[in-house]
Amino acid sequence: MVGTQAEKELLELVKPIVAAMGFQLVELGLHRSPNGSRVHVVIYRAEGVGVDDCAALSRNLRPRLELAAGLGEVGLEVSSPGLERVIKDPAEYEIFKGRGVRLWLRDAADWLDGVNEGVEDGALGLSRGGQRLRFGLEQIVKAKLDAS
């Protein structure tokens, strides 16, 4: 989710605020330019995330971000993960546990659909047609949420 020291510091600031408002932090991005900084926050809640939720979090985060040292002028974007989000980090399997997913496995000829059962011992559990399948994370080339 984060790589640079600035992103780690930003994560420490943002994550507790997101959690206190009842959301899970899915993604946090920081993009700097000579004109200021742009922060992108993706949040999730099983009951869904609406425009009002994003606006409320934005109102709560913006003043804190503006006070954060070194960010300069801050642009803030808060959004939901979307219906068919590409899963970018193994931690997202836990966030989206119980949701439908589509997997593209190494040497596969087509997408494999099922219900995400989370990661255990480095393998993703997938319910499909009454069966529970397991795939090592290294086998998964691409994964995304399935809105169908």
Locations of regions flagged by a protein language model:
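Short Lys/Arg-rich amphipathic alpha-helical segments
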Residues: 1-113, 117-148
